[in-house]
Amino acid sequence: MFRKINDNLSVSPQISLDDVAAAKAEGVSLIINNRPDGEDPGAPQSADIEAAARDAGLKYIAIPITHSGFSGPQVDAMIAALAEGDKALAYCRSGTRSTLLWALAQAKQGMEPDEIARLAGNAGYDITPVRAMIDALAAGS
């Protein structure tokens, strides 16, 4: 269920409370929620996942991404979340927004766009929807 982007990040579709324990068993120490509350009435709410994470001894951060797109502060928040070096699991409805946010964060930090595309592709995700933004960030624009 968890798709590995690199040694420090996996992404996933919406997780359940039980998935928090599975993530911990895989060595995850940080859960990043990229899904806004209320997007799917049947999905666990942010506070529920946060409580399960804290009960399991995991760190938790919410950086909700709506379908309206990504912002600079969201990219910066993802950079900050990953900067601590924790093994992280990021999730949203399908894992796509989590992957694209990671991709933008990596580009802003100077990772080559083709390497970003390769890593995302290895996990089954396509960065084409934000490739122009990735190229601009990687170029320092």
Description of each model-found segment:
Residues 1-89, 100-141:
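Cys-dependent protein tyrosine phosphatase-like superfamily
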Residues 92:
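Short cysteine clusters
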